[in-house]
């Protein structure tokens, strides 16, 4: 029997071996092929010595899955999840188990990427289209987006849209009603300051007294009052004011729509449609506008088009509005949104249907009526005379009520002026109303819920004015009226899932996206009620588990990045960019350098960089790159000197977006610092740094970290994400604060960038588990394996395709770019043809035409085995052989497997297929690997131009179901 130590038998590194794709034998074979003796040798060949860390990270040793779960269970148990009546945009909800199990906890849904390849994403595109339909039906407006990050940032986007489209061009004031949620006002003020807008806050009726470009109202307001805005909106619109409304999605089931009152834009959180509170997120925001504003909408929009066979197909519409194309001229910097959560909300609406939603909303409203009736019967004064779910009370002994509430393990809303608020939700039971009477009135009140209910039924409810009761039908489309049994719902979800290619089927080698394993053990705690059901504004002494987890994660991220502090709040990478630039902006202002507003950005940068700079009120100056893809130092020196007096910062990605470690990175930092600027190092490629180097060690001042890339949070088909920022100590006082929750940091006074103080805190356990389980050595080995995999793929493919950029020793970093332009010239085969043909081989295409047009950028993460890498390489080699047949004339340019890709079942069943110059087998079974595990695209290549020219962003017409 083999002699093994107890340490070996304990297998503390088992998770590491399961996270990393290639086993030891595969790693050695790959090292032999690329010409390196070991991972350390390969690292030395690739990473410039001047930036290599001399010490290991201080994270600790790796641990086993059971040990990690036990530790985080201990953290979860420290959270005291009281019954929450705080409201303020966050509510208890019952996640249907059929959605929890089959969507939220299903890698077929949470590991997919944003649907840039729509032919292999028709399932989630349909679910998102359903979300848009729900949004349009409930708001009464024409066109909805595919989700934004949260309600508060959606408000900021609404303000920006209002300025873009308002005909009141000379106006610079945005009015905000004084009864909106405070976190919404906080985020709006932060954004307005960057844009140079003046924000005026006051009673809604006073909006008519100002020269405005836009105005924001809450429906229902933070105190629960329901207001008929019809006349006010008409008056404002007559003055060319763009009217925006923050609305409660559940209330809209019963209430007159804001669109019918005359609103231009309506937005809000979809959280209470079956998405847990999660201590603040992640949640999807809906955003809906009049059709005339469609070109100014922020974020992604799903539209209906047709495929090559003329069949209905879905795709992302009007992408020319977005940051990856328009850069600093984009409507928004939004990239990752909240697609997984939007899909959950849409499935919630599908599962309950219009009748089920009305029952839920009516039950919530009835409980509010009963609570109000009982309190008023005892002489309690209410602030609001109308309500849907929220009662605000004045004149109480606040200290006594709070003491009784805490004793009963419930949280109420306590305002600074002594008002006490109670917001009811889907989870409220009649026993909860009894308990609320006890807490608010004290014992011996004698109130009976059943008697109060009978009284309301007999007399009728007046809490929703008759003029504000919804009269029009909602969700009449068949999709929302046929899946109310769990069997049908389960099959509908599965049917959509089967149309999509996600990581549970094959490698997704998207460059700059880091589609690594999202291990099941990392995902488990997210569903635990101790993490899922915590309100973000709960007293912090009830959230000790969360606060300890956040502190530990922040400490680890500080160590990994080489910075001095971390701010967790930004809930996407793009928001992290914005937050980091704001910190730089405020730092300059604190030194009397408010004029420093120029941001240098290399021409190869990701589109979010210039879009975020514009969002932060900066002027973008583009610097050149040389033929090797590196920053042109001469041009940088010239530009930095020219703008030295106004230089704010540079935004640079490392390793570069060209997939190499630039040797001159420290010199770049020095040049910018010498001219008074700060260095923002984009963390998109952090997966090539962890344990080997760090932004702080390199010389940067601030970075965002994509937790949904480097630190294992799944992409969710387009979100959720997290973009915390790391900063040097001089920037720490200038990171985001929050108006509601103030944990006692020096940045507490700053404005917020997200609705919740800790952003999408509900998914932080994923990154915590990832780091905890891997430990210092595991994190480093993951990075080294990512380098190995990329260089293995690069060297294999270089025999068939030109590789565009390489670094020292002819190596790449964690990704490589193959140049398809020579092939296109010689054969007429485009990068699009190759991308779609990969679908036939069972692969999602690599990143297409970024950062260079006519290329594919490939990032095989550390989680992919040599077997999977070889399967991808074989597919690319086979495709090269197919291109050769087009080059030789054997196959026509306009009739070959690449031009006609992807192929569907309908194609091979078509008798006319025999007229093609290639066989059915070549079309759909181009390799032996495909025969054993075939992924079938459900539509042919989609016509993008038709979709934008014939814009339709709602569910299919009823005729499609006849």
Swiss-Prot record:
Instruction: Give the matching Pfam families.
Output: GcvP2_C, GDC-P
Return the CDD domains for the record: GDC-P
EC assignment: 1.4.4.2
What does it catalyze? N(6)-[(R)-lipoyl]-L-lysyl-[glycine-cleavage complex H protein] + glycine + H(+) = N(6)-[(R)-S(8)-aminomethyldihydrolipoyl]-L-lysyl-[glycine-cleavage complex H protein] + CO2
**What's in the keyword line of the UniProt record?**
Oxidoreductase, Pyridoxal phosphate
**GO CC list:** cytosol; glycine cleavage complex
Q: Which InterPro entries match?
A: GcvP, GDC-P_C, GDC-P_N, GDC_P, PyrdxlP-dep_Trfase, PyrdxlP-dep_Trfase_major, PyrdxlP-dep_Trfase_small
One GO MF term attached to the UniProt entry: pyridoxal phosphate binding
Q: What class of enzyme is it?
A: oxidoreductase
For activity, the cofactor(s) needed are: pyridoxal 5'-phosphate
The Gene Ontology biological process terms listed for this entry are: glycine decarboxylation via glycine cleavage system
Q: Which residues carry this modification: N6-(pyridoxal phosphate)lysine?
A: 709
Family to which the UniProt record says this protein belongs:
Belongs to the GcvP family.
Q: What does this protein do?
A: The glycine cleavage system catalyzes the degradation of glycine. The P protein binds the alpha-amino group of glycine through its pyridoxal phosphate cofactor; CO(2) is released and the remaining methylamine moiety is then transferred to the lipoamide cofactor of the H protein.
Assembly and partners are described as: The glycine cleavage system is composed of four proteins: P, T, L and H.
Q: Quote the protein name from its UniProt record.
A: Glycine dehydrogenase (decarboxylating)
Q: Which organism is it from?
A: Shewanella baltica (strain OS223)
List the gene name. Answer: gcvP
């Amino acid at each position: 029997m083999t002699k093994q130590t107890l340490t070996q038998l304990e297998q503390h590194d088992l998770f590491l071996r399961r996270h990393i794709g290639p086993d030891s034998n595969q790693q050695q074979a790959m090292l032999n092929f690329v010409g390196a003796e070991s991972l350390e040798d390969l690292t030395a060949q690739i990473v410039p010595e001047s930036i290599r860390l001399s010490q290991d990270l201080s994270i600790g040793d790796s641990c086993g899955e059971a040990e990690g779960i036990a530790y985080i269970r201990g953290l979860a148990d420290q959270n005291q999840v009281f019954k929450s009546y705080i409201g303020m945009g966050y509510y208890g909800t019952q996640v249907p188990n059929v959605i929890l199990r089959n969507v939220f906890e299903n890698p077929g849904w949470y590991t997919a990427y944003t649907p840039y390849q729509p032919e292999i994403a028709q399932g989630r595109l349909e679910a998102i289209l359903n979300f848009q339909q729900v949004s349009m039906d409930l708001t009464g407006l024409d066109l909805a987006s595919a989700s934004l990050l949260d309600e508060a940032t959606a408000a900021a986007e609404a303000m920006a849209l209002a300025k873009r489209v308002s005909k009141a061009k000379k106006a610079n004031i945005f009015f905000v009603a004084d009864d909106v949620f405070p976190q919404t006002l906080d985020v709006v003020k932060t954004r307005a300051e960057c844009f140079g807008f003046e924000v005026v806050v006051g009673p809604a009726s006073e909006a008519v007294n100002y020269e405005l470009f836009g105005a924001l109202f809450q429906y229902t307001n933070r105190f629960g009052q329901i207001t008929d805005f019809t006349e006010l909106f008409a008056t404002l619109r007559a003055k060319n004011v763009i009217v925006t409304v923050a609305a409660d999605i559940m209330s809209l089931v019963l209430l007159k729509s804001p669109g019918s009152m005359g609103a231009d834009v309506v937005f809000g959180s979809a959280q209470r449609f079956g998405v847990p509170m999660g201590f603040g997120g992640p949640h999807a925001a809906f955003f809906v506008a009049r059709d005339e504003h469609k070109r100014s909408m922020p974020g992604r929009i799903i539209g209906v088009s047709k495929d090559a066979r003329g069949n209905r197909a879905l795709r992302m519409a009007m992408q020319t509005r977005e940051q990856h194309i328009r850069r600093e001229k984009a409507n928004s910097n939004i990239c990752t949104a909240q697609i997984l959560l939007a899909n959950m909300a849409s499935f919630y609406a599908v599962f309950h249907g219009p009748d089920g939603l009305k029952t839920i909303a009516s039950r919530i409203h009835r409980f509010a009526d009963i609570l109000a009736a009982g309190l008023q019967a005892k002489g309690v004064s209410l602030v609001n005379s109308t309500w849907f779910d929220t009662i605000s009370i004045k004149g109480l002994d606040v200290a006594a009520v709070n003491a009784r509430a805490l004793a009963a393990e419930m949280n109420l809303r306590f305002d600074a002026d002594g008002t006490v608020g109670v917001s009811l939700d889907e989870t409220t039971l009649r026993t909860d109303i009894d308990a609320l009477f006890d807490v608010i009135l004290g014992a011996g009140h004698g109130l009976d819920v059943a008697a109060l209910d009978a009284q309301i039924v007999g007399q009728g409810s007046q809490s929703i004015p008759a003029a504000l009761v919804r009269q029009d039908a909602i969700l009449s489309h068949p999709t929302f009226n046929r899946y109310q049994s769990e069997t049908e719902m389960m099959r509908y979800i599965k049917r959509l899932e089967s149309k999509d290619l996600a990581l549970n089927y094959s490698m997704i080698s998207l460059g700059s996206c880091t589609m690594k394993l999202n291990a099941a053990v990392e995902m488990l705690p997210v569903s635990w009620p101790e993490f899922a059901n915590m309100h973000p504004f709960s007293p912090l002494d009830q959230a000790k588990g969360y606060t300890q987890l956040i502190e530990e994660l922040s400490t680890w991220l500080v160590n990994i990045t080489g910075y001095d502090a971390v701010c967790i709040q930004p809930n996407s990478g793009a928001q992290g960019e914005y937050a980091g630039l704001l910190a730089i902006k405020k730092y300059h202002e604190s030194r009397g350098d408010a004029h420093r507003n120029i941001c240098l950005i290399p021409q190869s940068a990701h589109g979010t960089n210039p879009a975020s700079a514009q969002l932060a009120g900066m002027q973008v100056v583009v610097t050149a790159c040389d033929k090797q893809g590196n920053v042109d130092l001469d041009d940088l020196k010239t530009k930095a000197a020219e703008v030295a007096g106004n230089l704010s910062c540079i935004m640079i990605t490392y390793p570069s977006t060209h997939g190499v470690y630039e040797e001159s990175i420290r010199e770049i930092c020095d040049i910018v610092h010498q001219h008074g600027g700060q260095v923002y190092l984009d963390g998109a490629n952090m997966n090539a740094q962890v344990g080997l180097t760090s932004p702080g060690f390199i010389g940067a001042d601030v970075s965002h970290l994509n937790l949904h890339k480097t630190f294992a949070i799944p992409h969710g088909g387009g979100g959720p994400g997290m973009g915390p920022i790391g900063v040097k100590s001089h920037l720490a006082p200038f990171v985001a604060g929050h108006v509601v929750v103030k944990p006692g940091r020096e940045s507490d006074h700053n404005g917020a960038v997200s609705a919740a103080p800790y952003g999408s805190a509900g998914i932080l356990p994923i990154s915590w588990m990832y780091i905890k389980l891997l430990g210092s050595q595991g994190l480093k080995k993951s990075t080294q394996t990512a380098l190995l995999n990329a260089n293995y793929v690069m060297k294999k493919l270089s025999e068939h395709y030109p590789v565009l950029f390489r670094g020292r020793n002819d190596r790449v970093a964690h990704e490589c770019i193959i140049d398809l332009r020579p092939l296109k010239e010689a054969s007429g085969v485009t990068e699009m043809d190759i991308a779609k043909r990969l679908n036939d081989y069972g692969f999602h295409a690599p990143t297409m035409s970024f950062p260079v047009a006519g290329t594919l950028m490939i990032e095989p993460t550390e989680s992919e085995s040599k077997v999977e890498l070889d399967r991808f390489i074989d597919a690319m080699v086979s495709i090269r052989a197919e291109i050769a047949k087009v080059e030789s004339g054997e196959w026509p340019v306009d009739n070959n497997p690449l031009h006609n890709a992807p192929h569907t079942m309908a194609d091979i069943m078509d008798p006319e297929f025999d007229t093609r110059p290639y066989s059915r087998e070549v079309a759909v079974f181009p390799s032996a690997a495909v025969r054993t595990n075939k992924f079938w695209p459900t539509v042919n290549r989609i016509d993008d131009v038709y979709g934008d020219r014939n814009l339709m962003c709602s569910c299919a017409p009823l005729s499609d179901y006849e």
